[in-house]
Amino acid sequence: MELQKGKGAAAAAAAASGAAGGGGGGAGAGAPGGGRLLLSTSLDAKDELEERLERCMSIVTSMTAGVSEREANDALNAYVCKGLPQHEEICLGLFTLILTEPAQAQKCYRDLALVSRDGMNIVLNKINQILMEKYLKLQDTCRTQLVWLVRELVKSGVLGADGVCMTFMKQIAGGDVTAKNIWLAESVLDILTEQREWVLKSSILIAMAVYTYLRLIVDHHGTAQLQALRQKEVDFCISLLRERFMECLMIGRDLVRLLQNVARIPEFELLWKDIIHNPQALSPQFTGILQLLQSRTSRKFLACRLTPDMETKLLFMTSRVRFGQQKRYQDWFQRQYLSTPDSQSLRCDLIRYICGVVHPSNEVLSSDILPRWAIIGWLLTACTSNVAASNAKLALFYDWLFFSPDKDSIMNIEPAILVMHHSMKPHPAITATLLDFMCRIIPNFYPPLEGHVRQGVFSSLNHIVEKRVLAHLAPLFDNPKLDKELRAMLREKFPEFCSSPSPPVEVKIEEPVSMEMDNHMSDKDESCYDNAEAAFSDDEEDLNSKGKKREFRFHPIKETVVEEPVDITPYLDQLDESLRDKVLQLQKGSDTEAQCEVMQEIVDQVLEEDFDSEQLSVLASCLQELFKAHFRGEVLPEEITEESLEESVGKPLYLIFRNLCQMQEDNSSFSLLLDLLSELYQKQPKIGYHLLYYLRASKAAAGKMNLYESFAQATQLGDLHTCLMMDMKACQEDDVRLLCHLTPSIYTEFPDETLRSGELLNMIVAVIDSAQLQELVCHVMMGNLVMFRKDSVLNILIQSLDWETFEQYCAWQLFLAHNIPLETIIPILQHLKYKEHPEALSCLLLQLRREKPSEEMVKMVLSRPCHPDDQFTTSILRHWCMKHDELLAERIKSLLIKNNSLPRKRQSLRSSSSKLAQLTLEQILEHLDNLRLNLTNTKQNFFSQTPILQALQHVQASCDEAHKMKFSDLFSLAEEYEDSSTKPPKSRRKAALSSPRSRKNATQPPNAEEESGSSSASEEEDTKPKPTKRKRRGSSAVGSDSD
């Protein structure tokens, strides 16, 4: 297999030095268009990205050809210093050489490392773009070199390489055992295995890698080569699951689903035994399988098992294809991805993706677009394997089993009920099978948790009725098309839903929660899975595409989307004649330049002194209708350069913004244009984030971001914060790429509005992917973005505790990129409960282990309530014992003595006055006792240190009998220390008789001997006699006093 040879060459090159090649030259031998990046034919148009990369490569080649290495380096560095565009050209040129010229790869990588001024950010972004958009057309040689380059980036520890690895993993298709796919799976696995220490630094990468390879293990069986790969995958997953289980816990309930599929593999059998019978062996914070099953899986994980091409085409079907015209699309998808026996396992991935990721808006739901339930019905009916069919049904109902209305979304459970409802007439067998599965899964999923599963399914059905997805379930459960046994079982399991005689009615709702609705579909149910005329383009990509990664890059062959003609007739009669003529010219304008000229004339007329301001509302209505296409289209160019940004703001609408930027704020014309924008904003809220984009992208608007504040105050909202949040929310829903592009400038220009709460942060982390997270982290570290400040970071992180797991990890990653002392947020510990907040506890624990224990840190750690299942405090104390034992001993001594000195009444008053836990003496002693037990079988001598023993003596001398009894083993350490210590001179004893501890030490020799004797005698006894022993010591001390 040629690609395997390439892999070997790449690996050899990675280990080589000097001018050794990058390997993989043999892989592309004889490929069409040799030396080029992408496969193409003579009929294909030249790819824009390829042209640009080849241009950059020719610049580098012209500068380095025929000169010495030193001269070449000098020339490259001199060129890079000229500015950012030149820096980008050289980086991309060297990057292209690495991909196309294996023999020069090692040298080019060294040059790239030397000239890069942005931590390889340009190269990382370009790799992500190629993987997401061009990988299927990439030449074999370039694929091999891309793997080689990623391996080098990982070896060099380049920040952001983890994001590239995750994008690479996304390209590994499930259910595909072709040579190229197996090569890719093995190549990425080799990188992750070789660079294991690097992998362990990224929690998200650990979880994503485990999720990916657990899923792939199922596909790899049969041949010796696949078995060998499978064993490597098993070893990799098992090692990460056992060593970093808390990081894997962020996957949520789908981790259990994947582990069930591999449960018969011996290594996973042993892991299952620990998960069920000994969860603490995996992590002190893991309480059992229920903890996993009650955690919803983030859409990031569900999406990672579909390749970009699959995802794009599936999204196209659910947003562009009309119901009744889907057959050719489905046939194409079937031929491309589901035609082999091995590919049947992909159906689960597709169903989980549709349920958990594809959540259409109410606008799409109420249209005639192909609904989700129809695609799932097709996937179920076309399944050719019994095992795959069972797994597909489990995937469909998986979120039902432990559904909680507070944590889970109605959109995750809605497809299953609608598949059953709509299949009853055309495919009753499908409905019967699914209802039977729903009943039988309750006792059979996991018998010890049968009660939880029953409650989950009941909550799902109840929520479906409450949200009016179906008004009643009785017509579905009591339908005469079902056999008697099944109907009896449904009545037995769900009597609450079998009482209403009303016919099934699906209701349109206006709630924010999106629902499926019946409306247009009733007459098409007969053929809901396999109808009509339409087709995918067989081209993997549309060469003229512009836009974000997940935009649709292919179109129907027989149907094209026809824009409905804009009708502004109702408004024209209300306009002055001259303005009406100009608006009509704007409507008829064929090119952007002509429209811009007319738009400028309209603005000029608005600014004339005799303009009737009452016409602003009508004019705004006309403009909103005329620019509908502009608001639907892409805003941010695919290639972000100064030229492309300037070109993107050359649209007619943006002329209003440009005129606004050229005016003084105290000018009456300025107010008039703001009023026009305010009217437009009422009719088209997207105008807000378009203004933000213009102020960010246009050179004419440089330094004018404060205009947005004037705009916000001119709107009906009248408030900057509310307006900004609404506009960013609209941007988040329309274009995540644009949201990420705007984020640095929004945080920089409006710090008071963005940094005081977590509202904007939550919007961002809810939609970004791993590559975009890495990009934001880079912005923070380069000083371009500040998302947290000391005075509000604690409150924001506390707010984040209610977010989804992946969102919380993103928030913590962004926080850790800032240079904010950990002590600033350490009080969050008092808000964290070990069952409810594992994400925050894991991140905080991993950060605390890098810090030296300050008194405040130790105080907060010790103030956590003691619980046998909460190992947080013991874990970090143990780590500090190993690394900073003397410092920790001093901190604990200080806290013990302080808390022991506080009057008891004052302590209880203080603790009752606050809802948050206060540090008490008993808490400290409980945590120390747990630590003592944890260190019992180690060589660590933490409790033999003088400060700890002195502090324990101090506490023992003044605490009550109940505490002495409870912590007798702990206090016995101090007694042994006292017995072994040298007695102080007589003169010092006399001077110190006023303190209880001194009086205790002043015990007369006969009593001391008696104490020693009783101590040695009690070594073979139980700990119960010890309080009695202390009483004897206490009485002797009193005797000393009386003397």
UniProtKB/Swiss-Prot annotation:
Residues where N-acetylmethionine is found: M1
Main location: nucleus
Keywords on record: Acetylation, Cytoplasm, DNA damage, DNA repair, Nucleus, Phosphoprotein
GO cellular component, one term: integrator complex
Compartment(s): Nucleus; Cytoplasm
Domain of life: Eukaryota
Pfam family, one: HEAT_Ints3_C
Residues modified to Phosphoserine: S502, S537, S995
GO biological process: DNA damage response; DNA repair; mitotic G2/M transition checkpoint; response to ionizing radiation; RNA polymerase II transcription initiation surveillance
InterPro entries from the UniProt entry: HEAT_Ints3_C (IPR056518), INTS3 (IPR045334), INTS3_N (IPR019333)
Biased composition (Acidic residues): 1008-1022
Residue ranges of the region described as Disordered: 977-1043
Family: Belongs to the Integrator subunit 3 family.
Subunit structure: Component of the Integrator complex, composed of core subunits INTS1, INTS2, INTS3, INTS4, INTS5, INTS6, INTS7, INTS8, INTS9/RC74, INTS10, INTS11/CPSF3L, INTS12, INTS13, INTS14 and INTS15. The core complex associates with protein phosphatase 2A subunits PPP2CA and PPP2R1A, to form the Integrator-PP2A (INTAC) complex. Component of the SOSS complex, composed of SOSS-B (SOSS-B1/NABP2 or SOSS-B2/NABP1), SOSS-A/INTS3 and SOSS-C/INIP. SOSS complexes containing SOSS-B1/NABP2 are more abundant than complexes containing SOSS-B2/NABP1.
Function: Component of the integrator complex, a multiprotein complex that terminates RNA polymerase II (Pol II) transcription in the promoter-proximal region of genes. Component of the SOSS complex, a multiprotein complex that functions downstream of the MRN complex to promote DNA repair and G2/M checkpoint. The SOSS complex associates with single-stranded DNA at DNA lesions and influences diverse endpoints in the cellular DNA damage response including cell-cycle checkpoint activation, recombinational repair and maintenance of genomic stability. The SOSS complex is required for efficient homologous recombination-dependent repair of double-strand breaks (DSBs) and ATM-dependent signaling pathways.
UniProt-recorded name of the protein: Integrator complex subunit 3
Lineage, uppermost ranks: Eukaryota, Metazoa, Chordata, Craniata, Vertebrata
